[in-house]
Amino acid sequence: MNLIPQKIKERVAQYVLQFSPQVDRLRSGSSLRQMKSMVLVYADHDEAKYKLVRDIATYIKKEYGVKRVMRVAYIDEESKFIPAWHLRKLETDYFCKSDLNWFGKPVSNVNPLMQEPFDVLIHFDPDSSVPLDFFVMASKAKMKVSNHSKLRTKDYDILLPTTKGDNWKQRNHRIIQFLAESPLS
């Protein structure tokens, strides 16, 4: 039985997220070819998206020589309903409703990932879910990049504008292209 209605939980979560302070972290920019580690954060809905993000991670490793490309997904299900194809592996992790506190903040298995100082965090689905926004806020990544975000712009170092008519794949390809061609060092 759910004692607190979902709408109230969502509003409390948005409020807490909005007024949460920024995390102290070492900020540093670099181009994709100079990076040693990165984390790709996304909302997972189906196996096709899982495979697409896996392919993006493989492409980044092969094309740009990034040694570690971690993928972290938020799955909006209880742990007992997690699909069989979504396993925790060496460079793949997820968190789900069972891993959140009552207002949607991740509190269990992803905490070590939030503390790890990745060279860059790329958020593929900004504003898609409060738990992902909490993850991004708490991350100690040296650089945080995403497409335009309405909720927590202060958490990102680089926000790329979206173009009308873009699909998910085009928007996120633009992020990778920007990081590959950027003069950051």
PLM segments and residue spans:
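Conserved nucleotide-cofactor-binding alpha/beta core module
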Residues: 61-114
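Short hydrophobic segments within beta-strands
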Residues: 40-43, 72-74
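Short, charged/polar "capping" segments at the starts of alpha-helices
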Residues: 48-49, 77-82, 153-154
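Gly/Ser/Thr-rich loops at beta-strand to alpha-helix junctions
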Residues: 44-48, 128-130
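Active-site and donor-binding regions of nucleotide-sugar-utilizing enzymes
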Residues: 94-163
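Short N-terminal or domain-adjacent regulatory/targeting segments
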Residues: 2-37, 47-51
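Active-site-proximal region of nucleotide-activated glycan assembly enzymes
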Residues: 1-7, 153-185
